[in-house]
Amino acid sequence: MLSPRKVKFRKWQKGRLRGMATRGATVSFGDIGLKAVEHGKLSSQQIEAARIAMMRHIKRGGKVWIRIFPDHPVTAKPLETRQGSGKGAPVGWCAPVKPGRVLYEIKGVSLELAKEALTRAAHKLPIKTTIVVREGL
């Protein structure tokens, strides 16, 4: 699972996801990519599950880029605990995603194989996505 090595604060505020993604909105490294269509938070487990689904489909060919990183801590209170008495302990990491953000990119395999691999990855994610092809291909 992906997680940051060091953070300035153990617990963050939740924040809000508003507007479109301004950075990371174009296919930069690969030939074809998976782009988010709606807001959401992807956990490190979901990011890894989608990556494994892609890699199993394309087997040994091609290269995959993960364009997001889970750097936002997620906290939770223990089960059967009353409310109050502070914020819960950190339990994992998530990546806030805005619409228009490219999540994964693939290069080095045929377009049909890459589309199928990205479709399998999209089934593992909790947000709506679309497949985009790099300009000029």
Curated annotation (Swiss-Prot):
Q: Name one GO biological process term.
A: translation
Report keywords, A-Z: Ribonucleoprotein, Ribosomal protein, RNA-binding, rRNA-binding, tRNA-binding
Protein's organism:
Nitratidesulfovibrio vulgaris (strain DSM 19637 / Miyazaki F)
Which InterPro entries does the UniProt entry name for this protein?
Answer: Ribosomal_uL16, Ribosomal_uL16_bact-type, Ribosomal_uL16_CS, Ribosomal_uL16_dom, Ribosomal_uL16_sf
In terms of domain of life, where is this protein from? Answer: Bacteria
Q: Taxonomically, what lineage is the organism? A: Bacteria, Pseudomonadati, Thermodesulfobacteriota, Desulfovibrionia, Desulfovibrionales
The record, for CDD domains, names:
Ribosomal_L16_L10e (cd01433)
Q: Which GO terms describe its cellular component?
A: cytosolic large ribosomal subunit
Q: Which family does it belong to?
A: Belongs to the universal ribosomal protein uL16 family.
Assembly behavior: Part of the 50S ribosomal subunit.
GO MF: rRNA binding; structural constituent of ribosome; tRNA binding
> What name appears for this protein in its UniProt entry?
Large ribosomal subunit protein uL16
The role this protein plays is: Binds 23S rRNA and is also seen to make contacts with the A and possibly P site tRNAs.
Keyword rRNA-binding in record: yes
